[in-house]
Structure formats: C-alpha cells, structure tokens
C-alpha cells in the first residue's frame, strides 16, 4: 500500500488536518463482492477538486472526521474506511461528477436499513465542502441482503392468496381522502369492490382523525369487503392504514386488522420510519397479512436532480425493509416519472437479477438472490384512457390504482369501478391476441365502449384530461 494512504498504528500519530484524498481516494482499489457500493452525484464548492470532494464523501460517510485523531491508531482504518475508487464526469454538467464509493460490509448492522442509511446518508449531505450531493444508486451485495427478511410475501404468494392471475390488479383510493365518516367511507369501499376492483385504499394521511377513528374505519371496511366478496365470488381487500404516532399503536392496528380477517394492511414507510416498517413487515409475514406501502414524503428526498436521494435507492431500501406493494409513479399520470427511469426501478423492485444499465439509471448490477419481489403501484391522475399505456408499460405484475378515475365517474362509484375493470379486461385480451397497445390502445378502448355504457361515460368525461409537463427526473 502507498504510504499516502497508510492509516495503521505503525505510522504513529501526527496531529493536524490533512486532505481527505490522502487517505480516502484510492483509484487502485478493486471492489469486493461483499462491498456495498454507492454512486453519488457530487457538486463541489468552487475550488474543491473532484478527488478531494469524492474522498470527503467516502470519509464523512464512514470512518473520517475533520482532523486526525489519536484513536485512529487503535484500529485498522484500512479495514473499515469507505473508499472513493472512481470518479467520472456527468455529461453536459461541468460542475458535477459521479463519485463511486465502496464500503466494507462490517460497517453496517445486519438487517437494519436504519443503520445503513444513518451511515451512508446520515451526515455527509450537510458537508460544507459540497454545494450539493445526491445518492443515485446503491449495490447491495447478497451477503448483506440475505440478512433481511424482505417483503412479507412477494408477488407469487400474493397472487395465490388472491387467486388472481394473468392481469394487473385494480385498485382505488377512496376520495375525498379526509372528512368522510367511517360508515360513508365503508359504503364507498363496498361500491368500488362490488363494481369489479380488487382493492380499495386508505389515502396516506388517513390515520385516526376526529372525523373517523381508525377502529370504526377498520370495522366498516371489513364489512364492505365481506359483502363484496359474497356478491362477486372474488377475493377483495382494502389497504387499512396502520401508520400511527408510535410503533406500539401501529402494531395494535395491525393486530386488529388480522383479527377482522382482512387480507392486507398499509404503512407510510418514509414518514413512519424504516424501523417501524421492518417491524410491521415481520408481523405481516408471521400472521399472513399482505403489506401495502405508500411513499409519502418521497419527493422531498428524491425530486431534485442534484441533491437528495434517487427513488431507486428508496425502492431498494423498501424491498429490504419489507413491503408487498409500493407506489412507483405512473409515467402517464399527474405525478413525476420518466419512462425508462421508472421502469429501471420497477425492475429493481420485481426482478431477482438486474443488470447494470445506465440508460435506465441503474449504476450497478443487483442480485437479490431469493428475496421476494414487490408489486409496483401506478397511482395518481390516471383514468380509463390511460389503461392501454399502463398495461403496456407495467405489465401483469403491477397494481393500477384509480382514485378520482373511479369515484369521479358521472354515474357513481360502482359504475366507475365497472368502467375500469372493463377497460383493463379489454386491454389484456387485446394484448393476448397480439395487438399493439402502444399503437392501438385508443381503438381497443373505443371498441369496448360499444358494449359497456359505464366505460363509454367515463371515456366521454375524461377525454380531454392530460397532465403534460416537463419531466424533472431525467438521466
């Protein structure tokens, strides 16, 4: 090893401040299969060299501090330090670059997303030498991912539980999201499920407010589920939001949901926290509950291109922490999401092995080994005219969730659900017959309108609705 990067006790203690790059920039380093690898988009302050900025990120997110300390001599920092092992420019950006950092596995507690994030993104993002910093991607080695349970059940087990195959699942978020009484809320759930949906959903901020306490909502929703199941012969569910102010209260709500015999509960995993989410995921596996995950607050973290954390990192974290569904954008609706980038992290959620593909924002090959997959949920500003595109983009292993696109139907909730189910079945049949939904999708919907008045009414009311804005999240 070069003397410039030597940090063992034999060197002796020399007080003072030295450049991070002397210790933490190691371009000759060969990454190990057990290393956790990170790709950071770094924007240094003027005058800070890329090598120093990249090394500072590696140092401050692992063993380093701002000055040399004598206790460095009590351990082998070469074993534990993060290393900036490569730097590459960002096309079209003179002041930005990608710094690749390798972290030894021993830096992280097994089975703890909380500890992983506390180390890698917990402190370094406030570092003064950097104008901005964004974590673009992580490579989680099998040696670490195998310490996590992961999703409570996964895609195949969910399909077996629901006895539903060969198509996306259909959902609906009950609106208005706040203000309904528990009984009226349950009525809306029943009407949507009776009309043909597989799931209905609590909105992310429905917890236990004065107008509708959680226990009342759970009871009326369970009644709606059982009534709809009896009338349709299909298994139904409602995402009962167990998110609460304390972990103990969250678990109380999940336990009550299990006692009611419902199939699925819900958690806001970012506002609720990874420790709470992992605890709930373990309970759900042990007790046969599916777990729907909402990503409320994600855009605070991932919306800006130069600072924060890309959603693909949050998606990987969720797969480790545990969830059977997670919201993933729509590409075509009202919420942010560019197609190639979105499909990149959708594959990271669903597939076992994902190759590095920079055209889709995937910086590292990811091998999940045997960890179950997560169903991506497309939700936000979508309606029946979007059904062909959603079916083509997301494929069968997804949940397509229409809130206003169900409850906004001019004839009511049940006809809105009928319209969505008919549109989905028509698109799946057309695809299975070999038709190109990307090119013929509108024609498929128009043909289905001829024998479904509910779909025809929905198509008429939403024919002019579009959400066309420039996408922020580009490569």
UniProtKB/Swiss-Prot annotation:
Its EC number is 4.1.1.39. The basic functional RuBisCO is composed of a large chain homodimer in a 'head-to-tail' conformation. In form I RuBisCO this homodimer is arranged in a barrel-like tetramer with the small subunits forming a tetrameric 'cap' on each end of the 'barrel'. The active site is at residues 175, 294. GO terms for biological process: photorespiration; reductive pentose-phosphate cycle. Mg(2+) binds at residues 201, 203-204. Residues 1-2 form a propeptide. Binds 1 Mg(2+) ion per subunit. Its cofactor is Mg(2+). The modification N6,N6,N6-trimethyllysine is found at residue 14. The modification N-acetylproline is found at residue 3. It is found in: Plastid, Chloroplast. GO terms for molecular function: magnesium ion binding; monooxygenase activity; ribulose-bisphosphate carboxylase activity. The gene is rbcL. It is an enzyme of class 4 (lyase). Substrate binds at residues 123, 173, 177, 295, 327, 379. RuBisCO catalyzes two reactions: the carboxylation of D-ribulose 1,5-bisphosphate, the primary event in carbon dioxide fixation, as well as the oxidative fragmentation of the pentose substrate in the photorespiration process. Both reactions occur simultaneously and in competition at the same active site. This is Ribulose bisphosphate carboxylase large chain. The disulfide bond which can form in the large chain dimeric partners within the hexadecamer appears to be associated with oxidative stress and protein turnover. It catalyses: 2 (2R)-3-phosphoglycerate + 2 H(+) = D-ribulose 1,5-bisphosphate + CO2 + H2O; D-ribulose 1,5-bisphosphate + O2 = 2-phosphoglycolate + (2R)-3-phosphoglycerate + 2 H(+). InterPro entries: RuBisCO, RuBisCo_large_chain_AS, RuBisCO_lsu_C, RuBisCO_lsu_C_sf, RuBisCO_lsu_fd_N, RuBisCO_lsu_N_sf, RuBisCO_lsuI. The lineage of its organism: Eukaryota, Viridiplantae, Streptophyta, Embryophyta, Tracheophyta. Keywords: Acetylation, Calvin cycle, Carbon dioxide fixation, Chloroplast, Disulfide bond, Lyase, Magnesium, Metal-binding, Methylation, Monooxygenase, Oxidoreductase, Photorespiration, Photosynthesis, Plastid. Belongs to the RuBisCO large chain family. Type I subfamily. The modification N6-carboxylysine is found at residue 201.
